[in-house]
């Protein structure tokens, strides 16, 4: 019996997700635990762990949704879908190495693997943009790609700040400035591709940073800036979500204007 291409990708994805999730879960109970190491290495971009936990749970559930097009479409699955799933498998492999390095407090290796995670997530996000905006594609491919890309960009910044471990006054001032450049990194794809969903994802992440900084009280003003950025990202998401409807309404108004003028015009004398 020959195993189909779809079956191979389903098996590979389920195995990668299982190993990745089991690694995360197991290191919650090791010594030192994942939670202890994360709390011990608070940085200016330390995010609330409970909000991150909820984010990770949604992310793993969204990964499982990648199986949907393979089961529903069969031979009609395009190459971009297979490519996204293939990249997501590698992403979960890098998660295992990242957790291993982080729980052993090998922070420079953690920073290196964070770049591997970001590279994989960036590839996933770029490939997902080539898919059509159908409901199945949105929940099964685009949503996981946006969640992974948003979190990976945050984790790169957190991992490098943890590796450098600079807590002096100069670093604190730099962090208060850099958080705005960090927000601008999200705005490039958000505004470039009119991605309201990614804007919501980034708003959630900045909100978690704000709450995390508010509780640890290590870096002055950082939580205030994070809350402001979260509000701005939410506003951008709302505007980008409504933009197609406004454009469609403007187009319909423009098309109906000549007809109204013709109807209002009197007969030629």
Curated annotation (Swiss-Prot):
Domain of life: Eukaryota
Matching InterPro entries: DUF1774_fun
Keyword flag Nucleotide-binding: no
Membrane topology qualifier: Multi-pass membrane protein
Main localization of the protein described in the UniProt heading: membrane
Subcellular location: Membrane
Record-annotated membrane-spanning stretches: 9-29, 50-70, 82-102, 107-127, 147-167, 173-193, 200-220, 224-244
Keywords: Membrane, Transmembrane, Transmembrane helix
One GO CC annotation: membrane
Protein's UniProt keywords contain Ribonucleoprotein: no
Signal peptide feature range: none
Pfam families linked to this entry: DUF1774
Annotated protein name in UniProt: Uncharacterized protein C637.03
Organism of this sequence: Schizosaccharomyces pombe (strain 972 / ATCC 24843)
